Amino acid sequence: MSKSLFITFEGTEGCGKSTQIELLAKTLRVLGYPVHTLREPGGTPVGEEVRHTLKHSKTNVAMTPEAELLLVNASRAQLVREVIRPALAVGEVVLCDRFYDSTTAYQGYGRGLDLALVKSVIDFAVGNTRPDLTLFLHVPPEVSAERLLSRQSILPFIRDRMEEGDRHFFARVAKGYEAIAAAEPDRVRVVDGAGTIEVVCAKIWEYVQPVLPRVGRW
């Protein structure tokens, strides 16, 4: 099998994941690495339909935590088999905006579903496809809330169900991420996401650079 690298980005809403993925992808491509960027839920035609249902559909108001868990992992199962595994098989660097740690944090800690049940569903969806490195962009709740308000003021007509939780919900999600990072320190690296874009980018590079030798360049 070709050398490859699977990096996931995690964090609460407004932590800056999408911006940092774009910057890292650009840097890696300039250096000659084959890069594939993805997002969850989504990344495939099936996954994008699920994403719309989970986040923006008018019909999701009464969605239960159990349904949310299954839909997220249906999208993930498709993404793993249709995109992630093939990309890794040919030696690409895969950068994914969220992966299964989001499910543990949001549906497990946030929604209060049994963590053992959540893990079993995740395991079924991803099999042995696991990230080599996870970057958890940690921001204080007040920073996250401020960034969300700013984003919503720019896009006021786009409803996102996953941004509608109260502060207690997002506090539980943050606690979930902290627990994950504490349990797997070799895989999960905590990055202070409250700094400037440039400072956060530099810190991410400190964690990414040591794992790059395992990947071939073009």
What are these language model-derived features?
Residues 2-6:
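Pre-Walker A (Motif I) flank of P-loop NTPase domains
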Residues 9:
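Hydrophobic anchor at the beta1->P-loop junction of P-loop NTPases
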Residues 14:
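Walker A (P-loop) phosphate-binding loop of P-loop NTPases
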Residues 17:
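Conserved lysine of the Walker
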Residues 20:
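Hydrophobic positions on the alpha1 helix immediately C-terminal to the Walker A/P-loop
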Residues 25, 142-218:
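NTP-dependent small-molecule kinase module
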Residues 31-126, 203:
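ATP-dependent small-molecule kinase phosphotransfer cores
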Residues 96-98, 127-148:
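Conserved phosphate-donor/acceptor-positioning beta-strand/loop module used by diverse small-molecule
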